[in-house]
């Protein structure tokens, strides 16, 4: 236990730069104006209102302590004015300003960690596609994987209590509770479809949710990284971090005797790999299904005891990678054997050897994509292209540009697909839907419109990469064929845009 305590103290000592300064210090507002701090490290919030200046935010926060100005009529809640703003805008200003200020220690910690590790071109690590080279390197050596959906906390107070581990400023937490209690139904349950995660307050609640996920991962990954030090000494899992050292001084069994119906024991699994994007994570291991089941029930008890979140064990499925695919970031990924025949010669005798290797196979999800296209009226549920009637009033160039942009984004994102045939089918649907939309606008048939426009329209749908390679190499060359069959991962994809309403 003494050795384990040393590792815990080392881990907690690295959290000191994560403490949150007082919210009412003047220099905090000056730091928020540092565009190099927020834009080079953190993603810009697209929905951030430029009218919400930090000076207004500071004045509004100060006036919130004057209760006679904070009372709002129930019958006239939407029309009540405060400093010239209605309630909704007032709520948005406070939430955006609070999120901007609390983001500062997060960004400072990220900058310092990148400097300590001497990470070169750290912006490449922010790309979604950077996860798949990790899959290609690690997952062929693993046997089992489990899809884990991180459950949402059922109450806003859980998010506030989670934030207190990194925000050591009680007045700001009380301010956050007051704000959430006033502007949102404090007693309602949180679900992903609730208006609490609407775009108008996206920045604040993404910050709260990310702090909740960060707390969950910090404990999970710490115990996973230190598992090799616990091989000979069984130790109960430490959940509460506020009474950390008190629990280390006394026997673990006494501390947790009244908290849990059964003692949870940590186990050694150095081959576990963990990957997450947003609320979905993949837990993969090289060991037996028994250890994977232990991880599953550990997560269920962890969420229930630490975050008071109920999760059903039956919803966490453990699959063998060689027999099942897993859906992650829009790709259907699986591990497939790659058998190659090698001719070997020993003196005068030659013989053939089968060299079997495993590789990651990433497939384009054709059926879900057709369903998405049908939902936004590009085709029917069978995959037959139809005209986009809502775009028929736009100009020809605008219609073509929209279709080309969607097709280019899909080609760019799914460039890592092992088989491009399904992707070409989706591009064909978009091309024909574009032609039908233009023909409907000009009250003509598709055949007549294609004859009049010629093949130039279809050339617009070629991506920039395809155009460059078609100029450098002939169509029949093996280089171009390898390009169409090969996988390309781009390091400039930071988010997944909406299929239609994208910029």
Swiss-Prot record:
A GO CC term assigned to this protein in UniProt: chloroplast
UniProt record, GO biological process: mRNA processing; RNA splicing; tRNA processing
Keyword tRNA processing carried by entry: yes
Gene Ontology molecular function: RNA binding
Key words of the record: Chloroplast, mRNA processing, Plastid, RNA-binding, tRNA processing
Localization per record: Plastid, Chloroplast
One Pfam family recorded for the sequence: MatK_N
Cystine crosslinks: none
InterPro entries reported in the protein's UniProt record: Domain_X, Maturase_MatK, Maturase_MatK_N
PANTHER family reported in the protein's UniProt record: MATURASE K (PTHR34811:SF1)
Membership in a protein family: Belongs to the intron maturase 2 family. MatK subfamily.
Function per UniProt: Usually encoded in the trnK tRNA gene intron. Probably assists in splicing its own and other chloroplast group II introns.
The protein's name: Maturase K
Organism name: Rosa carolina
Gene that this polypeptide is encoded by: matK
């Amino acid at each position: 236990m003494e050795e384990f305590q040393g590792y815990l103290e080392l881990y907690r000592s690295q959290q000191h730069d994560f403490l949150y300064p007082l919210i009412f210090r003047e220099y905090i507002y000056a730091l928020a104006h540092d565009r190099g701090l927020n834009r080079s490290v953190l993603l810009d919030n697209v929905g951030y209102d430029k009218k919400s200046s930090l000076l207004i935010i500071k004045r509004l926060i100060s006036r919130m302590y004057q209760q006679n100005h904070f009372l709002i009529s129930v019958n006239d809640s939407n029309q009540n004015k405060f400093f010239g703003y209605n309630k909704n805008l007032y709520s948005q200003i406070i939430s955006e300003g609070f999120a901007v200020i609390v983001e500062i220690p997060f960004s400072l910690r990220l900058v310092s960690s990148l400097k300590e590790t001497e990470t070169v071109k750290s912006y490449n690590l922010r790309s979604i596609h950077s996860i798949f080279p990790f899959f290609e390197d690690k997952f062929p050596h693993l046997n089992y994987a489990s899809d884990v959906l991180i459950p949402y906390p059922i109450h806003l107070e859980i998010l506030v209590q989670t934030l207190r581990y990194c925000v050591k400023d009680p007045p700001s937490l009380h301010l956050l509770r007051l704000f959430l209690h006033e502007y949102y139904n404090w007693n309602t349950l949180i679900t992903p479809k609730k208006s609490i995660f609407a775009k108008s307050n996206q920045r604040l609640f993404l910050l709260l949710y990310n702090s909740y996920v960060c707390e969950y991962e910090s404990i999970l990954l710490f115990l996973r990284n230190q598992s090799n030090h616990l091989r000979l000494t069984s130790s109960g899992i430490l959940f509460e971090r506020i009474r950390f050292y008190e629990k280390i001084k006394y026997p673990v069994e006494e501390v947790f005797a009244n908290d849990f119906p059964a003692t949870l024991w940590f186990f050694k699994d150095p081959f576990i790999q963990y990957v997450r994007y947003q609320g979905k994570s993949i837990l993969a291991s090289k060991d037996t299904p028994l250890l994977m089941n232990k991880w599953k029930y550990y997560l269920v008890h962890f969420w229930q005891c630490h975050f008071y979140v109920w999760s059903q064990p039956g919803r966490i499925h453990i699959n063998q990678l060689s027999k099942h695919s897993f859906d992650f970031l829009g790709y259907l990924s699986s591990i497939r054997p790659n058998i190659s025949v090698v001719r070997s010669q020993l003196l005068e005798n030659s013989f053939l050897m089968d060299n079997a290797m495993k590789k990651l196979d990433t497939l384009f999800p054709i059926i879900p994509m057709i369903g998405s296209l049908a939902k936004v009226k590009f085709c029917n549920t069978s995959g037959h292209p139809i005209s986009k009637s809502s775009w028929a009033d736009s100009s020809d160039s605008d219609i073509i540009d929209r279709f080309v942009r969607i097709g280019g984004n899909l080609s760019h994102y799914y460039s890592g697909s092992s088989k491009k045939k399904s992707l070409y089918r989706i591009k064909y649907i978009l091309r024909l839907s574009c032609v039908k939309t233009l023909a409907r606008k000009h009250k003509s048939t598709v055949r007549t419109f294609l004859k009049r426009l010629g093949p130039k329209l279809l050339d617009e749908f070629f991506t920039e990469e395809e155009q460059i390679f078609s100029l450098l190499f002939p169509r029949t060359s093996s280089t171009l064929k390898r390009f169409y069959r090969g996988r390309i991962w781009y390091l400039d994809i930071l988010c997944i845009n909406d299929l239609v309403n994208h910029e």
